[in-house]
Amino acid sequence: MALALAISTLADATLLFHHPSAAPLARRVVDADPSAVRLGGCSWQAFEDGFPNLTIDAADVDAIENGAECAFLACLDTPAAVFGNMALIYALAQLGARHFRVLVPFFATGTMERVDAVGQVATAAAMARILSATPHCGSGPSTVVVYDVHALQEQFYFSDNVHVQLKSAVPLLHEKLAELAARPGGPAPVVVYPDD
């Protein structure tokens, strides 16, 4: 699994935190290599006004402050989710983890990476700036890992405050498509992606 590989390059027992909507994927990452990754604990509550009320488990805070590796599986697919994700990302980085990685499996604003008319806003650049504000971790800049970014030039929207890694899960897709195509008597896989 591509996300597990991005984490497994760090030391053992990386704490993986995640947005609640990413819980199934986070569990799959841990299941792929439970000796290298364990779930970090965080309470995702909300105040009456809807703003997040987040609390990182005390034992995990202690582990991070003592140099544990840390990663966050972000879910930035809706504007409503961005604030809570970023609040926790900033807090985790500030705890001083030896290494801190923000895993972005879907860069939702990525398809709006260029402008072709005066006044149009490249929201991909805005999201990159928000992620670029991630504080440094114990060893220096935090790392933002973006999967299957829409356009390679988007890596240059990030500032030098963070280290950016572009990864792809396309090889895994190719493997799965080949597996499906090899099934006897089964329909051939068809890939459709609407893009204007």
List the predicted regions and their residue ranges.
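PRPP-associated nucleotide enzymes
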Residues: 1-196
